[in-house]
Amino acid sequence: MDNKKIRERTEEEIDLRKKVLLELLELLNKKKIFSFIWGGVLLGFIRDKNFIKWDWDVEIGFYSKDFKKNWSIILKLMEENNFTVDYFNFEELKINVSKYTSKETTTFSLMGWRYDLFTGNYIRNKLNVPKKYFEKMEKIKLFGAEFFCPSPVTEYLSYIYGNWKVPLKTVNKNEYLSSKNLRKNNWFLYCKIDKFLFNLFN
């Protein structure tokens, strides 16, 4: 996506984004599936007490073991509650859903984080977060709900974004993510391992 194509969401679209997030949180909590917010949604909540209007997705995180264990349950929950499943890939530990608006307006990205035994980081593709931020989650309150997030949250945001207090209107990850966070890792090695195990036992 070109920065020239960045679009600020309307108040109505932001309200629907909030509605869907709260629905998702309630569904996961009812099934006792632990989740947390991270990335741009967390940045907006801490800095602006709201969503970032030009952000296109809402990131909901899971520990990989929880996500894999509940994979089929989560997909069934989405289907039963009228979510559109726009993309899912078990190896990538990723499910993208949308509701009430198009996926272009808001994509809800449910993603598992793998622990890398070699580096001591929690990882996704080219994303690297030290274990200490994921060891003990903290709660933040917004929209009348409680959300778990990496802790300590402001230190985590500094690690991920650098100067996170200054809004940066861009879709280029090389511009808005810190070099400590955005670098190559063993993500695809773990994808291959999970694929092998999945095929072996299914």
Language-model features and meaning:
Residues 12, 18, 104-202:
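Catalytic cores of NTP-dependent nucleotidyl/adenyl transfer enzymes across multiple folds
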Residues 1-38:
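Helical scaffold of the NTase/Pol beta-like nucleotidyltransferase catalytic core
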Residues 25-58, 65:
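Active-site nucleotide-donor binding segment shared across nucleotidyl transfer reactions
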Residues 22-25, 29, 75, 79, ...:
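Non-transmembrane alpha-helical segments in soluble domains
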Residues 74-121:
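Acidic, glycine-rich loop-and-strand cores that form catalytic or ligand-binding grooves
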Residues 13-20, 61-92:
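Metal-dependent nucleotidyltransferase catalytic core
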Residues 39, 88-91, 171:
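Acidic carboxylate-rich catalytic motifs and surrounding loops in phosphoryl-/glycosyl-chemistry enzymes
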Residues 33, 80-84, 162-166:
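Short aromatic/hydrophobic-glycine micro-motifs
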